[in-house]
Amino acid sequence: MAEARFAVRPTAALHHVGFEVDTSRKQTQLYVSRRGLVLYVPHPYFIIKNMRRSFWHGVDKVQFALYPIPLSVVTAFSFGVFLWVLNSPADAWIRVNCVSDILWRLDERNFISSRIPSRYRMPALCANVAFGAVTLFTALQRFVLRKLLSYNRWIYEGQGKLTRKTMLWGFILKTFFMHNLKRTGAYGSCLPSQPLPDLKITVQRFMKSMVPFYEEKTAEWEHLKKLSEDFLRNEGPQLQRYLWLKYLLADNYMTDWWIKYVYLAQRESLCINSNWFGVAFAKYLPTPLQASRAAALVYNLIKVKKSLDRRTFPPQFSGLVPLDMNQYRYVFNTTRIPGREMDVLAQHEGIKHIVVIHKGRFYQLEVLHPLTNHQLTPYQLEMALESILHSEDETDPVEALIPAFTTAPRAEWADIRDKHFVNNAYNVKPLRVIEEAIFVLCLDEMEPKSLEEESMMYLCGNGHNRWCDKSFNVIVTEGGHCGVHAEHSWGDALTLANVAEYSHASDEFKELYTEDGHVKKLPEDEVALAEGKFKVFVPNRIRFTTDAVMKRAVQGAQERCIREIKDVDIRVCRFADYGKGFPKKQRCSPDAWVQMAMQLAYFRDQGHFDQTYEAASMRMYRKGRTETIRTVSEESCAFVRAMEQPSLSAEAKLKLLRVACERHQKTSRDAIAGCGIDRHLFGLYCASTGFEVASEFLQAAMQSKWKLSTSQVLTRQLPAKFHPPNDEPFETPNGGFGPVQDDGYGVCYCLYGENLFYFTITSKHSCNSTSSTRLAEHIKKALRDMAALTGWN
C-alpha cells in the first residue's frame, strides 16, 4: 500500500505550527502574541460541555488505571472499609497498631485531613489507604499481564504443537487475566511495547533477504556487504542507542515517525498513491434503493461511532492476546489537513452531522438529534436522503469540482486552501463543515457494470466526487451497491474493515429493510407518526463562492486527476477452483501458498525477481501499525525456478514448494513477533537523519523499490454469530489500492471462505512492461500448476 511506496524514501520534514486562537475548538485558549497575552473564553454552554467531557474522560482514565477491577468495586470496597472503621471501637486493632500509628503521623501533615472531623478522620484515612492498596495491586497485575503478553513463542507454535510452557502461559492468561471487559481500549495500558530488534541480527536478515537480487552482481554485492560491515562497526551502535532511548521513553518507538514521514510528510496526491478502497459485496444486494441502502449504512455506522464514544465498542483479540485499539479513535471526525511541508491529522468532537455529495452539490445532514443527541432513525435518514436525490437545486459547475483540490499534490492544495478557503470569509465556514463532519457520504449517479468499474468508482470516482482528506468516504451507487474510499495515515485497513463489518453484518440479515427494499420504521417512528410529531431533519445546502482564479485552479486539478485515473489498469480476478481449504490439506499456510503463487506469476510475467512487500499487522503491541514481510527468499526463488524446469518431477517441485511456504511462514512470524527488518532500518534511518549521522548503508537500504506490493485484509473479524450460517452469498473481493511503483503492481487478495480466492490487481497503462489482466491470468495458472503438483485436477 502507500507505506510500501513511501517507506523507502522518508523525508525528515519538520512542521512548525504557530500558536493562535482557533475559535472553532470551543475551548478556553491562552497564547502570547505581539499584542500581548490573549485569552479566549468560549460561550458558557461549551465550557459546561467541555467540563462534562473532561469529567468522563477522567473517569475512563481512573477505570483503566484500576484494570482489571471495575471502578465501582474499588469504590464500594473503600466505602466498606470506611464504614467498618467508623463503627469499630476506639481500641479495635484496626485503629490501634504500629501501621496505623505511622499513617496517622503522616496524615497529620495533610492540611486537608486536618479539616475533617476527628470522628471521620481515621475511617477516611483507612479508606484512602485501601484505595491506594487496590491501585497498587492492580498496577502489579497490569505489570504481570504486560510481561505475559510479551511472551511470543506461541506465534511460532501451530495448533496441536504447543509446548508445555505455552500451554501454561495460556492457562494463566485465560484464568487470571482475560476478563470479559467490554470497554474499548481496556487492555491498552497492558500491551507491551513493540520490541526493538538486535542491530546485528537485523543487518544479517536484511543481507540474507537481498541475496536473490545480487546473484549475478558480484561487485555490487561485495560493496553492499562492506557497507553493512562498516555500519555495524561504526555508526550503527550509536544509532541503535538513540533508538533504545526512544524505546524506553515512548509507547512505540516507531509509530510517530511512521505516521509523520511515511504519510504526513509525503507531498504526492492522496488519490491512487496513498488512499485505498473497500468493496462491501461482490454480488449480494440487500436493496436496490439508493436512499434506503445509504440510510441503513449511515445508521449502523453512527451506532458504531456512539459505541466508540461511550467506550463500549468491544476490544479485539488475536486468540487470547488483546489488540491495540488506538486507531479506532481516528475512524470518525478525522480529516487530514494539507500543509506546505507536512500535513496534520485534525479531530473534532461533539459533531452531529455528516456531509453528503450528490451531483456536485454538498449537503450538511444531521444524524444526531440537536437537543437530545439521540441517533436519528433509518426512516428519518431515508426521508432526508430522498430529499437530496430528488432536489432540483442548481449545480454550480465550478463549485462541483472543489473536491478535486483534495486530489492535488499536498503543498499545492495547502496553498489553495489557505488562499481560497481559510482566508476567505465566505468559504471558511463551508470548508469547516466538511472537514469537521463525522464522515462523507457520496451518492453517485451511475451504476457499475463490473467489479472493475465498481472498484475504480471507489478508488477515485470521477476525479471530483471524493473528499480524499476525510478519514473515509462511504459511496453508494445508483443501484444500491456500496464501498468506501479511505485515507491511510490515521489507521490501517483492518481497523476500518472491522467497523464496516458491523454495518454490513446487519445488511446480511436485512434487519433494517422491508420486503419492498425501503428501511423499516422503528417503534419510535410509529409513535411519532401516530402522534403527528414525526420530524425529518432537512439537509442544509453547503455553498462556496468561486472566482476565475479558483476556476482555473480547480479545473487544472481535475484534469490532472482524470489523467491519473485513466492511467490506472485495474483487474478483479475471481478464482473459484479451490480456496484456502486446499493448501491446509497440503500442510501449507494458505497465505504462504498464495504468496508463492504470486511469486511464480510475477516471474512468468517479468522474467525476473523483484522485491515484494506484504504487510503484517503489529497491533499486538501498544500503538502498533505494520511491519514488512519480505516475500522473496532463496527458498521461494528455488521453487519458482523449479516450476519452470519440465525435467523436474512433481514430487521434487512440491517439496520445494513446501520448503518455500515454511520459509515464508517463518518470515511472517518473525515480523509479527517484532523481529522484522524494515521498521527497524527505517527507525535507524530517521535517527541518522535527525542526528545528522551519515550512513551509506542505510542510504543504500532505503533505495529499495517494492515492485510488487501485496496486502491481505481479513474478510471476517467478528464472531460467527454476527453472520448468517451460509456466507456464500456475501463473497467480496474486499478492496484494493493503486500500484506502489509506476512500473510495478499492487495486489490486494482475499481468502474468502474455504473455496474462493479474490485478487484485485492494479498497474499503470503507461508502463509497457506491466498488465493487470496478464498478471491475473498468470496468477490463476500458477495456482492451478501448484495444485497439480499434488495430483489435483
Language-model features: locations:
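Long, Pro/Ser/Thr-rich low-complexity/intrinsically disordered regulatory tracts in eukaryotic proteins
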Residues: 2-470, 479-480, 487, 491-793
